[in-house]
A protein has these predicted regions:
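Cytosolic regulatory/linker segments at or just downstream of nucleotide-handling modules
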Residues: 185-187, 194, 207, 213-255
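Short, well-ordered loop/turn elements at secondary-structure boundaries
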Residues: 60-62, 181, 213-215
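Juxtacatalytic helix/coil linker segments
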Residues: 2-111, 126
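Catalytic core of nucleotidyl cyclases, primarily class III adenylyl/guanylyl cyclases
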Residues: 68, 99-153, 160-204, 228, ...
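Short amphipathic alpha-helical segments
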Residues: 32, 89-94, 159, 207, ...
Length: 255
């Protein structure tokens, strides 16, 4: 009887470790810990309430934000069967995933051919504040500089790495368009089903705009990034409508 109980306990412990490992491949470890703590507290109180995801939200400062996508992906998909496209994307994103640890980068998500990553939210130099505090902003100059340098290095490695992955059928290298920005954001989980870790804020929107208005095989960065990493060979972009609307001066880095 005792032997059977011990076996059940060991099996339960093993399953819990597997579940946590699986969750930590989807959500940041700190978020998983908070979710499990909520669940444990409700179990002790014999409650069965829904997870309160709003309590997990945090405000981050000095964050580097990256958006990257494939040039000509839509036309490529029309020429190649879906399975080959999926294999190609998996091979390419595996390269990017492997680079994350080298540069203190956290992959937030992939949406189709778009790859979103940050430094300073889960990894890197973190400056965190409760979302309820809005009347002060912590000093982040050192953290911003460190995070921006790591993100620029990661972006360069992404462009180099993408050139090594060939598109099926066409046999041409993948070309990236990369956008970078630095600033603040709010992180958290929205909703109570199909949990997804998300970033929100104006600076996230600007990073996405840097990618959309970028140049193939180059890194398109806001002036805020350039000021933090001035040692790179940045070239000021021509003023275009998107830049005027957002009020952001931007620069290109050839890789």
């Amino acid at each position: 009887m005792v032997k059977q109980q011990n076996q059940i306990i060991r099996e339960k412990s093993r399953n819990e470790r597997m579940q946590r490992h699986f969750l930590e491949n989807i959500l940041p470890a700190s978020v998983v810990e908070k979710l499990q703590l909520q669940q444990e507290q409700w179990s002790l109180q014999l409650q069965h309430d829904k997870i309160q995801t709003s309590s997990i939200s945090q405000r981050h400062f000095g964050v580097g934000i990256l958006y990257a996508d494939l040039v000509g992906f839509t036309s490529f998909c029309k020429q190649v069967d879906p399975f080959s496209v999926m294999v190609f994307l998996n091979d390419l994103f595996e390269v990017f995933d492997g680079l994350c640890d080298d540069f203190n980068v956290y992959k937030v998500e992939t949406v189709g051919d778009c790859y979103v990553a940050t430094v300073g939210v889960v990894t890197g130099e973190q400056t965190v504040q409760d979302v309820s505090i809005t009347d002060s902003m912590p000093k982040t100059s050192t953290a911003s500089r460190t995070n921006a340098k790591d993100l620029v290095s990661f972006a360069k490695a992404m462009v180099w790495g993408s050139r090594q992955v060939k598109k099926p059928v066409l046999d041409t290298p993948a070309l990236l368009r990369v956008g970078l920005h630095t600033g603040s954001c709010i992180s958290g989980i929205i909703g109570t089903r199909n949990f997804k870790f998300s970033l929100l804020g104006d600076d996230v929107t600007i990073a996405a705009a840097m990618e959309k208005t970028g140049v193939p095989d180059c890194i398109h960065a806001s002036e805020d990034v350039v000021k933090l990493v001035p040692e790179e060979r940045w070239e000021k972009c021509k003023v275009h409508e998107a830049a005027v609307q957002s009020g952001v001066t931007s620069f290109l880095l050839s890789v």
